[in-house]
Amino acid sequence: MGPGARLALLALLALGGDPAAATGREDTFSALTSVARALAPERRLLGTLRRYLRGEEARLRDLTRFYDKVLSLHEDLKIPVVNPLLAFTVIKRLQSDWRNVVHSLEATENIRALKDGYEKVEQDLPAFEDLEGAARALMRLQDVYMLNVKGLARGVFQRVTGSSITDLYSPRQLFSLTADDCFQVGKVAYDTGDYYHAIPWLEEAVSLFRRAHGEWKTEDEASLEDALDYLAFACFQVGNVSCALSLSREFLVYSPDNKRMARNVLKYERLLAENGHQMAAETAIQRPNVPHLQTRDTYEGLCQTLGSQPTHYQIPSLYCSYETNSSPYLLLQPARKEVVHLRPLIALYHDFVSDEEAQKIRELAEPWLQRSVVASGEKQLQVEYRISKSAWLKDTVDPMLVTLDHRIAALTGLDIQPPYAEYLQVVNYGIGGHYEPHFDHATSPSSPLYRMKSGNRVATFMIYLSSVEAGGATAFIYGNFSVPVVKNAALFWWNLHRSGEGDGDTLHAGCPVLVGDKWVANKWIHEYGQEFRRPCSTNPED
């Protein structure tokens, strides 16, 4: 029985005070005047039933709207989930919206079947931690690419620099966020005390709820009152008491009986009266510092270039060539080499793999993908500064991988057979996927990299297995340059000097993927086995 039906029953019970009841219902038939008088309560019943039907019609219209919205996304199968806004809404819908829809309904027979169906697949749906991760990914993109929250809510990617706003990327199809979407992002930040991110997202949620005149949808978890409540306290926490007071007063317009909010209003009024304009002014909120990332400004600045490079005539020492490395393997089909930087020496080999090979590698790796880890002392940990999944492929998995190994060995001149090189690591980046500045080589003698007993990682060979629409560049922090994602190309650099010391200039990062599905394959080659292929040198510059 729905809420409307319960109201109808209450209305019927309320009819007990009618004067006609005093004569007893059992003798209504005995006089026509009593029959006529009985029509009056029926008219009231009709009114109650009409209100119930209208409520049910509104509820069904809302459910139909939700059904049509989700169905339209499934019917358009040509759209890959590469837009971070679309990806966030998919996770939120599966984790939160469906649960709210199903549990908002009453337990009729049909609804019971719907709930049973939901419970059967519930274990396969994203968890709340996934929703939190997707929300943090949007905040990461907001920070690194200086994105405007209002623009993101409309589905556009705009960069904010001072008072100017410029379009950073224009998607072919817009995916806007709802008020409840914005509220959920803001709440994730709010729950960790991150008011720098919470406030703009909650402000946008309030704005969108107001624009909808406070209309609540079945799948929504929050309402205008919720958004006002959270935003008011966030403003108070950063010292903007005037804003907190204004929002709290607005809250009381919609919920005048809320005693907690009434007490807050009195507190804010008292604080303003005692401190005057000192607490009324808006306070500048500092972005939370990232303690493990001391090179944040350089890293983000390089990511914001989206991998744009100077042309070769601007730096004549950079060049392109056909490379055989004196290998018979490459004699008939030399590699297309582009030197993108000299110190450290970074080479980009265009079309190193074919579309078919890149697709095959992705297909081989996909069933084995697991959350990527990083070396921390003697342990390997999952961390927030590396968001991706990875898999390791032995060359015995498919003959194509043996061919790929031969090609890498011919081009680098190095021995890449185990244990002198690691298995091929295939990485798929998630929503806003990134890997903040790091070295590929070990910087500690206790690093797990030494477990292979083949020395440190002397070189990195990284293959781009896909293209992206925006973001995802590889940024070299101390080299002060970045390389864009070039599908099927391979990036090569030396991690160690010939002396065996690590090259500090190879500190690099995978910039967050703004829009796209980024796949890379890494082949890490170790010191041992390369003694005569890359001889040692006492010159620290080599």
Swiss-Prot record:
UniProt-annotated binding residues for Fe cation: H438, D440, H508
Start and stop residues of the TPR repeats: 225-258
Pfam family, one: P4Ha_N
Keywords: Coiled coil, Dioxygenase, Endoplasmic reticulum, Glycoprotein, Iron, Metal-binding, Oxidoreductase, Signal, TPR repeat, Vitamin C
PTM summary: N-glycosylation plays no role in the catalytic activity.
SUPFAM superfamilies named among the record's database cross-references: TPR-like (SSF48452)
Domain annotation Fe2OG dioxygenase: ranges: 420-527
Binding residue positions for 2-oxoglutarate: K518
Record-level Gene Ontology MF annotations: iron ion binding; L-ascorbic acid binding; procollagen-proline 4-dioxygenase activity
Keyword flag GTP-binding: no
Manganese found in the keyword field: no
Signal peptide: 1-24
Reaction catalyzed: L-prolyl-[collagen] + 2-oxoglutarate + O2 = trans-4-hydroxy-L-prolyl-[collagen] + succinate + CO2
Glycosylation sites: N240, N480
Function: Catalyzes the post-translational formation of 4-hydroxyproline in -Xaa-Pro-Gly- sequences in collagens and other proteins.
Name the UniProt record assigns to this protein: Prolyl 4-hydroxylase subunit alpha-3
Source taxonomy: Eukaryota, Metazoa, Chordata, Craniata, Vertebrata
Gene that this sequence comes from: P4ha3
